[in-house]
Structure formats: structure tokens, C-alpha cells
């Protein structure tokens, strides 16, 4: 609405950059969403290792964080963190652009659903607390399909506004809300 109009009238460069980024993100997300999950995970392995070598500051931060957590990090463990982080990132397009029914089929084993079912049967409320690393968007989509009511997720919007719009479009469909 009005905010978009203000951007267009007062700062055409910002509007053009936002539009370009939105189109670019949407294009690549749709491309990745069409790929088999196994291929995305293999790609994540390669990209995660590349990021490990290219991002010295991030690599050092992971080593420091692991030491702070009382772990003895080695190169293999830190590379695994990068691979898993990229894997989670490459799963986002799947969560945002595939049909919920096809996402549901990706889950081959679910542990602990009996606790959710017991709470539902007892008429109790539910609060899911999930880590911010991993397949939380895929899991949220899966859970929202199985619940008899909408699933509302809270999150901190990304700094890149175009990415937030793509995320909202992907999360707020079916029985998902933010």
C-alpha cells in the first residue's frame, strides 16, 4: 500500500533493488524447490565445505562456540556444522514452495506424536519450541497439516525485506500463520 508507494515515489533505487531481489530469491527458491531433496542435501555438502574455507570469521566463531559449549571442536565437526546449516537453508525453498501434501510425504519417521495427540485429546493447548537450525520450516509445515487448527509461528524477520516477503508467502498457506 502506502509504504510501497512511498518507496516508489521517493526512492526508486530502493524499490528497484527490492523488486530485483524479490524476483531473484523467488526464482532460485522455485528452482531449488523443484529439485529432489537428496540432490539439495548433496549440494549442501559441497557448499557447506566451500563456505567453511571461504568464511574464516564464521569458521572461527563456530570453533569458539563449540569450545564455549564444552566441546572439543575439530575440522570435521566444524565442517559438519557448515554442511548442516547450508542443508537447512536449502530446505527452505522446499518448505515455502512445495505443496503441503508433498512435504508431508518427506517425513518417514515421527517420534513423540503421541504426546501431541494426548494433549489434543485432553483439550489442552500446545506450544512447540524449536531450534532455529535445521528443518524447522519443514517440520512446521508437516505439523500444521496434522493439527485440527492453524499453527501460528513467531519469528524474527530477516534484514532483507524481499526475503521476508518470500518467507511469509511460504509460511502463511494452508493452516500456517505467522
Residue ranges of predicted features:
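Membrane-anchoring hydrophobic helices of lipid-metabolizing enzymes
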Residues: 17-130, 164-169
Amino acid at each position: 500500500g502506502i509504504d510501497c508507494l512511498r518507496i516508489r515515489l521517493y526512492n526508486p533505487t530502493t524499490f528497484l533493488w527490492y523488486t530485483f531481489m524479490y524476483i531473484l530469491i523467488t526464482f532460485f527458491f522455485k528452482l531449488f524447490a523443484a529439485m529432489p531433496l537428496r540432490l539439495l542435501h548433496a549440494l549442501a555438502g559441497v557448499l557447506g565445505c566451500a563456505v567453511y574455507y571461504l568464511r574464516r570469521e564464521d569458521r572461527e566463531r563456530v570453533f569458539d562456540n563449540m569450545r564455549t559449549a564444552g566441546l572439543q571442536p575439530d575440522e570435521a565437526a566444524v565442517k559438519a556444522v557448515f554442511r548442516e546449516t547450508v542443508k537447512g537453508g536449502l530446505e527452505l525453498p522446499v518448505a515455502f514452495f512445495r505443496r503441503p501434501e508433498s512435504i508431508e510425504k518427506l517425513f518417514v519417521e515421527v517420534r513423540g506424536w503421541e504426546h501431541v495427540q494426548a494433549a489434543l485429546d485432553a483439550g489442552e493447548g500446545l506450544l512447540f519450541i524449536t531450534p532455529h537450525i535445521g528443518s524447522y520450516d519443514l517440520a512446521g509445515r508437516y505439523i500444521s497439516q496434522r493439527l485440527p487448527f492453524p499453527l501460528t509461528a513467531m519469528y524474527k524477520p530477516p534484514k532483507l525485506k524481499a526475503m521476508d516477503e518470500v518467507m511469509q508467502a511460504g509460511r502463511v498457506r494452508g493452516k500456517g500463520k505467522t
